[in-house]
């Protein structure tokens, strides 16, 4: 059909793929239904009977179709594919996924916006989630990142407040520029991420023209038990491509599902998107001498000092068979690690180790890892966790549900023990506020001076001013003060743009 894309033809494709006649409609318990288009009533105009179990079955299930929306990253797209190792990194990491060149590991990916609801526009100015689930022989490994290498805050205790400011005002239920800019200007460590957000990369052209980053610092352990710090990068093989402000705004109204559609159509037409994975590594000794806190997620590691090391390629070659089953129910958690990969002292990472799994248990139930898309199907689950709502397995039959035991229960894994690193830690227990004690602007200055050209600087300032001009005057002044600390030209240009915006409103 001319003028229709692959996504528009999904139902036609489904019909054409069926090789047998359609079966009978059934109830949820499998009983065939003879009449589907009428309720059971007393006479043609009479009331519906309580014994109409077909209606009760249909309506009671419909009433429960929606599950809680993700509190962040609600709007997203998913796809499946594989990761293939192209370069040997076993000197750094003993995880089985990397144990030989040309090895392929199946994976699932979910891309998303962050602040919007599930019906919001794909082209909104927002960071993009970039989460990868690797189904390895050592269990599921989730690398849960974004399309930016940094984040707004470095202490997880501020995360709920930060997200509240990105959502809606509790009284007006409107997006509130005062909330948005009040928090960000009071937390100057956000300046790095804010500048990336309001740069051209804040509105990527779909999900396939953006990079992905693990963002956090992790520890890799090799077969000798030697640890090293690392960061993960995914560079798009399609090339970076962004939407200008006018196009992004136009698509928000004409095709709010633009990015979901683009990903689906690429895969359906066999134009499989791919990304190349790289790592940066830093020894413990280098970390001690690093000019910044190497575990600060508001900063990057210089690629000149810590060059990118190629690892492999991620290819997406299958669309979800059902969105709810394989995308809405997919659950990523930074706590899903495998032997050879461990957390670093990154505080934001530590907060996410708890919160992601916790929110999945709320949203999907305590046995969410039994949902097929989340199940570590390459290994047999053997532990001492039992029961719980919606346990749909054999519940590990009659195996002992305690440890240690004398009755042939599962034992500790020597390999996993050998790949557990020992990390000496000393210090005084206290609540250390880092808002003003760290360098919050040095790397942002580098971004302004060395990354952005003249035109990109102008667009960044215009994008910030367009949003900031809707905030209260004192918040505009505070923002200008912060950005002036990045660079005097930045503050001057922003002041000029805000004055232009102010005059245009009168």
From Swiss-Prot:
One Pfam family per UniProt: Catalase-rel
Any single GO BP term: regulation of synaptic plasticity
Iron recorded as keyword: yes
Active-site residues from the entry: 73, 146
Molecular function in Gene Ontology: catalase activity; heme binding; metal ion binding
PROSITE patterns registered for this protein in UniProt: CATALASE_1, CATALASE_2, CATALASE_3
Enzyme class, UniProt record, top EC level: oxidoreductase
Cofactor (UniProt): heme
Cellular compartments annotated: Peroxisome matrix
Similarity comment text for this entry: Belongs to the catalase family.
Annotated protein name in UniProt: Catalase
Gene: Cat
